[in-house]
Amino acid sequence: MNTPPVSRRHSPKFASDSHRLTSARAFTSGSDTYHDVRPDYPPDILRLLRSARRVLDVGAGTGKFTQLLCESPRFDQVYALDPSMDMLRTLVRFAPVPAWQATAEHTGCAAQLFDAVTCAQAWHWVDTKQASAELDRITTRDAQVLLVWNTLDVSVPWVHRLSRIMHSGDMLTQGFLPSVYKPWIITDQVHDRWEQELLPAQVHELTHTRSYWLRSNERIRARVTANLSWYLGEHLGYGPNDIVTLPYRLDGFVLSKIAQKLP
């Protein structure tokens, strides 16, 4: 099996806006599995943000990043939104915050309400031009936005091949810059590496949280399962009780507003 080259893209490639929306809308079920096996975020990532009175977690999913915000003493009030009600039902079990069904492009929030906005593992699903304008509308003049991604470290050859079998989204090249629009500019960034430990069965469950799996039919799912079982068991030699150490790349970006000139 020949593995394609590592992605050089700064954003995922969608055939159309319809394709992007269809892929994003796959996350309408399986939230419990998602929360159990998707990786957490290193707490140090929050050091990129100033303390804030009100912070909104956009595309919060099951609340992985929302929990981190709630555990920090630096944020007085935490709010969350996500397009998926299934995800939100799981979120409120782990992060008891005001949460509602909405998108980054249409938050349903009042103007200038938030001092900070976070968006973890979700910015690539949105219309970045519309979302940039909406986040400008709902935030204060000196607000910050934090964009965060956990990505399998495909610079490791066996992990790159694994990501292709899992269809995990090798879509963001090392050193990528996210697409943002005025008035936002990137003012700070952090890049780190860390590891997640899973059993082989949990690697299968992790695969089941990917957009590709969620929107595939049973025939495709059976093929992915067979390929992954072969790769983990026969090729890499992992037994059912062995720990698979998955290396991750963490990329975080702080956005601030361009200073507005007074008339």
Regions found by a protein language model. Give the residues of each.
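Conserved class I S-adenosyl-L-methionine
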Residues: 2-51, 53-61
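A generic alpha-to-beta junction signature in SAM-dependent methyltransferases
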Residues: 49, 126, 138-139
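Class I SAM-dependent methyltransferase SAM/SAH-binding core
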Residues: 62-106
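A short acidic, Gly/Pro-enriched loop at the edge of an enzyme's catalytic core
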Residues: 105-116
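A short SAM/SAH-binding and catalytic strip from SAM-dependent methyltransferases
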Residues: 115-129
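Conserved catalytic/acceptor-binding region of the Class I
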Residues: 130, 136, 140-198
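Conserved Class I S-adenosyl-L-methionine
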Residues: 183-263
